[in-house]
From Swiss-Prot:
One GO location term (cellular component): extracellular region
CDD domains xref list: Knot1 (cd00107)
One Pfam family it belongs to: Gamma-thionin
Protein family according to the UniProt entry: Belongs to the DEFL family.
Record bears the keyword Disulfide bond: yes
Protein name per Swiss-Prot or TrEMBL: Defensin-like protein
Disulphide bonds in the chain: 33-75, 42-62, 48-69, 52-71
SUPFAM superfamilies to which the protein is assigned, alphabetical: Scorpion toxin-like
GO BP of this protein: defense response to fungus; killing of cells of another organism
Keywords of this entry: Antimicrobial, Disulfide bond, Fungicide, Plant defense, Secreted, Signal
Amino acid sequence: MVLNNKTALWFMTLVLLLLSSREMVPGAEARLCRVRGTRGHCFNDHGCDKVCTREGFVRGKCNGILRRCICDRQC
């Protein structure tokens, strides 16, 4: 079976399109569990995030009316 130039070009374009679209699919991310940080009360997200990452968590955020520092860790 002999492929002419037009068919070969179409086939290569299709293969490249399929391969490039596969690279755009985001991978599965790890689940995150929320735990209360040891700091307790906080005033801003930046300070809470610094404390949580220093304690080995992924990130931290001030949450709720009482502004508690909540840290995220991988489950």
